[in-house]
Amino acid sequence: MADDVIDWLPYVDTLDQRYLNEVEKTVTAELAAIEQQELHPRIAELFPAVRHHWDEQYGLYKDNVVGLEGSNKRAAEDGVLSELKRRCPGIDISVYNDDSEDPVLLATIAGYRYHQDLVVTQLLPQTLENQWAINNAYLEGAEAAVRRQLQEQEQQIAQLDRHRQELQQREALRFRYLERQWRDRLHGNLERAAGNI
């Protein structure tokens, strides 16, 4: 059946159900064979990839630790942690020594801690709420854009189907005439061929 040529006009012709079943089966098999690891490129444009600042560290962890068990895993984790601390030493805590008697250093420590307290108790909740609202608004806008595009495409498909239907119905008489003419010539050729035998 793979070599059969099917010439079919859906709004004029009738088609045997077995052909439709075969087409559905083939389409299902082809769709199952397609790997869809990514979103459609137009969707990916709306949602650009965000690189997390821990991606590199996680890659190091994944390369060295994942798959290990027991003491081997613990030793590998310690090695990864040492490497990360070497690469990214963080804040030097020795600068903020509470045991110091130096009033300037103690004032610096107090200011730093007060700043941390303000950030955690007042600024962070406001910022998170604003970030949440901004992200929600962005996602709603992106979703609306995708829905609009989908609706436009569905309308275009429906319009194209209506055009095809009108065209096929308008030309149905010509198709029947051409088919009848083809059959008559075929019969005539067969009769002539049979008469020559």
UniProtKB/Swiss-Prot annotation:
It is found in: Nucleus. The gene is SNT309. Signal peptide: none annotated. It comes from Eremothecium gossypii (strain ATCC 10895 / CBS 109.51 / FGSC 9923 / NRRL Y-1056). Coiled coil: none annotated. Its main location: nucleus. The keyword Plastid does not apply. It comes from the Eukaryota. This is Pre-mRNA-splicing factor SNT309. One of its GO terms (cellular component) is spliceosomal complex. Associated with the spliceosome. GO terms for biological process: mRNA processing; RNA splicing. Keywords: mRNA processing, mRNA splicing, Nucleus, Spliceosome. The lineage of its organism: Eukaryota, Fungi, Dikarya, Ascomycota, Saccharomycotina. Involved in pre-mRNA splicing. The keyword Amino-acid biosynthesis does not apply.
